[in-house]
């Protein structure tokens, strides 16, 4: 994408949702509940378009999500002056309002995801194990561990058993190395 078009920020709706979720969890905020309902509607549009190709997903978003997002931002814009600037509610609202172009960018291309949850889920094991891997032995060993983790996550992303995938890849690489 970056070779054919300028780089474009596409914000993650899961991060926006999380801010309102935490707000609602902390004090049962009706404003946060309303925001969560509106964001859930956007995810419902995505569920409907899950198996669509890029152009169909784009058209579906234009027809179903665009007006919902405009209404959400209109609502937040009207609500913002009524919320104390230091309040957690203001921070959640401002997070969205200040990044409106990035949050609406996914509407412009059916290839853009609504969030980056798949990427975050793929790197979660690395983040969790980070302290365990501080002392991999050397920089080279750390690079090797990163290469193996890349293979494991690639296998998972393509619905393959990581153990079987690694066995096959490593076996084939040994065969290739031993051939004259």
Task: Enumerate the predicted regions with their spans.
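Short, conserved catalytic/metal-binding motifs centered on acidic residues
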Residues: 1, 15, 96, 120-124, ...
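Residue-level detector of conserved catalytic or cofactor/ligand-binding positions
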Residues: 175-180
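Long, amphipathic alpha-helical stalk/connector segments used for oligomerization, subunit docking
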Residues: 35-101
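A ubiquitous short alpha-helical element
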Residues: 30, 56-61, 133-139
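Amphipathic alpha-helical/coiled-coil segments positioned at domain termini
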Residues: 108-174
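Short acidic (Asp/Glu) and glycine-rich catalytic loops that position anionic groups and cofactors
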Residues: 13-22, 42-53, 71-78, 101-106, ...
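Structural motif
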Residues: 28-33, 83-89, 138-143
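Conserved beta-strand -> loop -> alpha-helix junction used to position metal-binding or nucleic-acid-contacting
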Residues: 3-37
